[in-house]
């Protein structure tokens, strides 16, 4: 065995990712031209994750439900409530932070050509339409709502199939999981390419003009990740939540930060859930579900940028409106994965609460894209790490009640 292979076998994946991260930063600073060329490594890694994630979710959920035995508990309902509670709590934190540290934007005059949903009804309609999408189309376009719908439907139908059929489905699940593990082993190389090319191309100059807004956004996300989420987990498991919280941030949050895709991070979260010894019938459904509806980071982004526009325009905000904004942001965030452009394109919907015209709201969206290098990364890291955190908390709480 070569020294390189021995090193790779002895070193944990997280350590390899940190080495790739530091090497990427160093290369971007020392040789930006070479770093730009290495963007290919990052693109290949993210493309591989995005390619395998829809198939993984479809097969894994279908196999989990098809092979489910009567009497087994899956604990999905408490996890779903944790997802909704966490998203609403994040929106409340963002409202409070925006009131304490109001941000002011220099809104650009350029017209945006993006299209945003016209109301909460339209967001919910999009979710329903996504759920009844053609299964082949859902797999091709990574429509995870549609994939989950078909996987659950087929899984329920196959529960009445013969033992041989269920065994084949289970073997398919094991095969796809093996491929995913192979893809994840290339995470250090992928993150090396992503970090080096992003820093070399964008630099940090584009972010300097929006430091205050970024500080509020990132501060809210850190507060939710390190204070609010641990409080929710403590309420659930009744013991020190920080070992579990920090483990999820380290193992899931770091990769999500650089891939900037909750869907691409699903395989990472499933692998972490397996290592934690969680209930497979539970996490195989709750992790993909969390990637579509557990959007604490998106709730923060929508709330902070909307209130930044409100403060810039001098619009007064009373307490009932602030509470309503929290609810709207939480509902919008749950639908963010079903909207092209994610959380940023749902900002005009929240702005409509304050009578802000769409032209100005879309300028706020443009500001969001400018700071997206950090905002989108931090948002995805919070969203994705919370998926596995709340899943683990619910499973551990159930084990505590039924040892």
Swiss-Prot record:
<dbReference type="InterPro" id="IPR001991">
    <property type="entry name" value="Na-dicarboxylate_symporter"/>
</dbReference>
<dbReference type="GO" id="GO:0015826">
    <property type="term" value="P:threonine transport"/>
</dbReference>
<keyword id="KW-0029">Amino-acid transport</keyword>
<comment type="function">
    <text>Involved in the import of serine and threonine into the cell, with the concomitant import of sodium (symport system).</text>
</comment>
<feature type="transmembrane region" description="Helical">
    <location>
        <begin position="175"/>
        <end position="195"/>
    </location>
</feature>
<keyword id="KW-0769">Symport</keyword>
<feature type="transmembrane region" description="Helical">
    <location>
        <begin position="138"/>
        <end position="158"/>
    </location>
</feature>
<dbReference type="GO" id="GO:0005886">
    <property type="term" value="C:plasma membrane"/>
</dbReference>
<dbReference type="GO" id="GO:0005295">
    <property type="term" value="F:neutral L-amino acid:sodium symporter activity"/>
</dbReference>
<keyword id="KW-0813">Transport</keyword>
<feature type="transmembrane region" description="Helical">
    <location>
        <begin position="14"/>
        <end position="34"/>
    </location>
</feature>
<feature type="transmembrane region" description="Helical">
    <location>
        <begin position="327"/>
        <end position="347"/>
    </location>
</feature>
<feature type="transmembrane region" description="Helical">
    <location>
        <begin position="45"/>
        <end position="65"/>
    </location>
</feature>
<keyword id="KW-0997">Cell inner membrane</keyword>
<dbReference type="GO" id="GO:0032329">
    <property type="term" value="P:serine transport"/>
</dbReference>
<protein>
    <recommendedName>
        <fullName>Serine/threonine transporter SstT</fullName>
    </recommendedName>
</protein>
<dbReference type="Pfam" id="PF00375">
    <property type="entry name" value="SDF"/>
</dbReference>
<feature type="transmembrane region" description="Helical">
    <location>
        <begin position="353"/>
        <end position="373"/>
    </location>
</feature>
<feature type="transmembrane region" description="Helical">
    <location>
        <begin position="79"/>
        <end position="99"/>
    </location>
</feature>
<dbReference type="InterPro" id="IPR023025">
    <property type="entry name" value="Ser_Thr_transp_SstT"/>
</dbReference>
<dbReference type="InterPro" id="IPR036458">
    <property type="entry name" value="Na:dicarbo_symporter_sf"/>
</dbReference>
<feature type="transmembrane region" description="Helical">
    <location>
        <begin position="295"/>
        <end position="315"/>
    </location>
</feature>
<keyword id="KW-1003">Cell membrane</keyword>
<keyword id="KW-0812">Transmembrane</keyword>
<keyword id="KW-0472">Membrane</keyword>
<comment type="similarity">
    <text>Belongs to the dicarboxylate/amino acid:cation symporter (DAACS) (TC 2.A.23) family.</text>
</comment>
<keyword id="KW-1133">Transmembrane helix</keyword>
<feature type="transmembrane region" description="Helical">
    <location>
        <begin position="214"/>
        <end position="234"/>
    </location>
</feature>
């Amino acid at each position: 065995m070569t020294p390189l292979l021995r090193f790779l076998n002895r070193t944990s994946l997280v350590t390899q990712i940190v080495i790739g991260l530091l090497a990427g930063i160093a290369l971007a600073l020392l040789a930006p031209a070479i770093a730009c060329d290495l963007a290919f490594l990052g693109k290949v890694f993210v493309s591989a994750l995005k390619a395998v994630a829809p198939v993984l979710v479809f097969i894994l959920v279908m196999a989990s439900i098809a092979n489910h035995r009567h009497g087994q508990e899956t604990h999905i309902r408490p996890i779903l409530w944790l997802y909704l509670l966490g998203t609403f709590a994040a929106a409340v934190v963002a409202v409070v932070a925006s009131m304490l540290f109001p941000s002011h934007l220099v809104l650009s005059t350029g017209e945006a050509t993006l299209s945003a949903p016209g109301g909460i009804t339209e967001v919910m309609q999009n979710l329903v339409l996504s759920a009844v999408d053609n299964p082949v189309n859902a797999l091709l376009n990574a429509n995870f709502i549609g994939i989950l719908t078909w996987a659950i439907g087929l899984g329920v139908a196959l529960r009445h199939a013969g033992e041989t059929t269920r065994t084949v489905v289970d073997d398919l699940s094991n095969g796809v999981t093996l491929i995913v593990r192979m893809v994840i082993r290339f995470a250090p190389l992928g993150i090396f390419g992503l970090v080096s090319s992003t820093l070399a191309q964008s630099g940090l100059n584009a972010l300097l003009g929006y430091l205050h807004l970024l500080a509020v956004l990132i501060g809210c996300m850190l507060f939710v990740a390190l204070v609010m989420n641990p409080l929710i987990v403590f309420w659930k498991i009744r013991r020190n939540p920080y070992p579990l919280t920090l483990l999820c941030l380290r193992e899931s949050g770091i990769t999500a930060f650089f891939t900037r895709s909750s869907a691409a991070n699903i395989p990472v979260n499933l692998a972490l859930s397996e290592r934690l010894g969680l209930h497979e019938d539970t996490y195989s459904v709750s992790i993909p579900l969390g990637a579509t509806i557990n959007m604490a980071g998106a709730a923060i982004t929508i709330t902070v940028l909307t209130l930044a526009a409100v403060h810039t325009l001098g619009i007064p905000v009373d307490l009932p409106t602030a509470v309503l904004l929290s609810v709207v942001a939480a509902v919008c965030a749950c639908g963010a994965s079903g909207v092209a452009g994610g959380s940023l394109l749902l900002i005009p919907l929240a702005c409509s609460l304050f009578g802000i015209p769409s032209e100005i709201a879309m300028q706020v969206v443009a500001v969001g894209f400018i700071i997206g290098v950090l905002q989108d990364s931090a948002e995805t890291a919070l969203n994705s790490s919370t998926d596995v955190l709340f899943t683990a908390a619910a499973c551990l709480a159930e084990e505590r009640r039924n040892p």
